[in-house]
Regions:
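Polar, enzyme-active/binding microenvironments
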Residues: 1-309
Length: 309
């Protein structure tokens, strides 16, 4: 079989395609990567119990706990290589919910010492600053969120075992239909009209339940393979990933969960960002010390260089 010779790599190669790059004198091709983690840039300040938004190459991390009893308002952006500190939250907090993109995100709920001091505060991020907006109807911590922008968000779950769900329209929160299973320390993905809720506690030892939100109601769908709590999630209702508290990670394809490659570092309550189950970022967390490290997850068609020596 003849291998195509090209001066530069094809712009849109497909799985199984092989070529010879005459500029680099290498044989390359596209293979399927079932899933792998790689080290990425360190955050400027290590912390746990933070929230995240955005994608693998344009992420936002905010809030959290830097050390026992020290709650953070810090916000950082990630550009695919390095983290940069930007303007703080107005209200320092940990165990908060959040989602959106790097230029349009929402932070809500959480707690401050003592740990039982939950709050209802909501803040909107416009890419430069956080602005206080209308509060959640029910203050809580250890909740999850799903949303694409700071004008459309879903908040659900919370401690202790709360099933409450609220929808944000850019101005106010409105209570909508509850989760079927009340829980906290869960994760979420998707938007306020097409969301996914998974994992959490209470349960022995961790919940495997997954629920799908259609804009009106929650419906139980296929379970996780392994119970997850103190975890993070990102993606869409049909393409999501769950990561933490341990090394374990799983991928959702819209119907079922599949166990994928272990994380490099076991991290509890990390921040997460990602567009789908082929591209994600996990950052911060603790096990038991607080981390500033982050790592990338990638799967699917990947260009590799073949050793033909």
């Amino acid at each position: 079989t003849n291998i195509e010779a090209v001066a530069s790599d094809p712009s849109n190669p497909v799985e199984g395609q092989v070529w010879y790059n005459t500029t680099s004198n290498t044989v390359k091709g596209v293979v399927n990567n079932p899933g792998s983690w790689s080290t990425s840039g360190n955050m400027t300040t290590g912390r746990r119990d933070l929230a995240g938004a955005g994608t693998q190459t344009a992420a936002l991390g905010f809030g959290g706990q830097t050390s026992p009893g020290t709650i953070s308002a810090l916000t950082e952006t990630y550009n695919g290589t390095s983290w940069t500190e930007v303007n703080d939250l107005n209200n320092a907090r940990q165990y908060l919910g959040g989602d959106g993109v790097q230029t349009s995100a929402l932070a809500f709920g959480g707690s401050n010492p003592p740990i039982t001091n939950v709050n209802q505060k909501t803040e909107s991020w416009n890419g430069s600053n956080w602005t206080n907006v209308n509060d959640l109807g029910t203050g809580r911590r250890l909740l999850a969120g799903a949303g694409a922008t700071n004008t459309a968000m879903l908040a659900f779950g919370g401690d202790p075992g709360i099933a409450n769900t609220e929808n944000w329209n850019g101005t106010n929160w409105t209570e909508v239909n509850d989760l079927n299973l009340g829980r906290h320390d869960l994760a979420g993905a998707g938007t306020n009209t097409a969301a996914l809720a998974f994992g959490g506690t209470p349960g022995t030892p961790r919940q495997i339940d997954t629920e799908l939100w259609n804009g009106t109601n929650w419906t139980e769908v296929s379970d996780l393979n392994v119970g997850h709590r103190e975890c993070s999630g990102c993606g869409t209702q049909t393409s999501a990933i769950v990561m933490g508290k341990d090394l374990l990670a799983e991928l959702w394809n819209g119907t079922n969960w599949t166990v994928t490659a272990d994380m490099n570092v076991p991290r509890a309550r990390p921040g997460g960002a990602g567009a789908n189950n082929t591209s994600a970022l996990a950052f911060g967390g603790e096990s038991p010390g607080t981390f500033n490290s982050s790592e990338n997850f990638n799967s699917g068609p990947t260009t590799v260089t073949f050793d033909v020596s």
